[in-house]
Amino acid sequence: MMRTLITIHPLPLLLLLQQLLQPVQFQEVDTDFDFSEDKKEEFEEYLEQFFSTGPTRPPTKEKVKRRVLIEPGMPLNHIEYCNHEIMGKNVYYKHRCVAEHYFLLMQYDELQNICYNRFVPCKNGIRKCNRSKGLVEGVYCNLTEAFEIPACKYESFYRKGYVLITCAWQNELQKLIPHTINDLVEPSEHRSFLSEDGVFVIPP
């Protein structure tokens, strides 16, 4: 039977065999869907993280607004706040749960202005951070279960304190923009003081 097929239809069978023996090739994914700008950027970021093997893109203004800033709604002291918001905002790193995360109840312009405040030591004491001048309400999320999405489980902690952030220069905007939220330090735990030159210092 096989010999008969090869004799009668040699060319189609050879072409089919050639296609089957070719290595699998991934085609470029068309992302030109009818999305809003926020959703389009979020979808492109998802595809980049899924296919990329290198470092992720630096955060943009829209990414910071989407992942960090929150509006009044669910009570900030709700026990499930982090589990709800982290899933809703797709907060993860290369499909793995983030070890910790901060949500801040403030406007983006207020957060960006912190980039121009004085430097203070970061939480780990290694880098320099910028500190907010006033107290900010927010939620600290700490990973308690699982390492891969969507099984991430977090413990939620309401905080009202000083925000410590790192900032990065963005060429497109020609401005410093928030890069990471390093800590949200409550005054009662802060034991802060000003050094002789007026710089805010966090004791070890």
Curated annotation (Swiss-Prot):
Disulfide bonds join 97-152, 115-167, 122-129. Residues 1-26 form the signal peptide. Pfam families: RnaseA. CDD domains: RNase_A. It is found in: Secreted. The keyword Membrane does not apply. GO terms for biological process: defense response to Gram-positive bacterium. The keyword Glycoprotein applies. Belongs to the pancreatic ribonuclease family. This is Inactive ribonuclease-like protein 9. It comes from Symphalangus syndactylus (Siamang).
